[in-house]
């Protein structure tokens, strides 16, 4: 099994290769084009959909980020299905007792369900690619110990993205730095209407 990676953006050729290849990537696809940054849904969706039709990957993984949560469901229009916000992934065999079939090397997609009360393990035996988004930080990064020898491919963007995909343009971006990292917080304190007043909310900050 080979590991392929895809990166898309503007003026990234020659800048991203050495950041990605050391993680053991066998083939890196670099899509570099004027309309690929800032992110908009249509161009990036068509890049993945059309590339997947060519490459026929068994598994496709994305980060469960703001972009990943938008892009993943759109790409799963390939009728591949998608498991969102996975906290663990495993490879294993699966027996479908109802259908009487055995499957080798499926992706076990593990995620909390029903408000975190249970952990669900999901498999996609029939459709490809097996798609999942993974929550950032739940898996340890492992650098490839050998020399990075991955192949780098620079596809022609126009072959994958039609001109009408660029009809939506980002005119301005306003990014505010979060005051508190709620994702990494072990305990979150919140207040509601019962606090009574703005002054009483200040007491929560002391906690």
Annotate the PLM regions:
Residues 1-207:
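N-terminal glycine-rich FAD/FM-binding segment characteristic of electron-transfer flavoproteins
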């Amino acid at each position: 099994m080979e590991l392929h990676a895809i990166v898309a953006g503007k003026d990234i050729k020659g800048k991203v290769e050495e950041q990605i290849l050391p993680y053991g990537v066998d083939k890196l696809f670099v899509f570099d084009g004027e309309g690929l940054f800032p992110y908009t849904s249509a161009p990036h969706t068509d890049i993945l959909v059309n590339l997947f039709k060519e490459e026929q990957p068994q598994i496709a993984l994305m980060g469960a980020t703001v972009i990943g949560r938008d892009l993943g469901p759109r790409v799963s229009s390939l009728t591949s299905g998608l498991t969102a916000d996975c906290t663990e992934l495993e490879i294993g065999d699966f027996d479908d007792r109802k259908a009487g079939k055995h499957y080798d090397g499926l992706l076990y997609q593990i995620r909390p369900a029903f408000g975190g009360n249970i952990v669900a393990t999901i498999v996609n035996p029939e459709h490809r690619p097996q798609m999942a988004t993974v929550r950032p930080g739940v898996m340890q990064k492992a650098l490839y110990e050998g020399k990075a020898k991955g192949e780098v491919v620079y596809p022609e963007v126009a072959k994958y993205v039609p001109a009408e995909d660029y009809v939506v343009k980002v005119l301005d971006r306003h990014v505010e730095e979060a005051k508190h990292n709620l994702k990494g917080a072990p305990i979150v304190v919140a207040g509601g209407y019962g606090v009574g007043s703005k002054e009483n909310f200040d007491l929560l900050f002391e906690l």
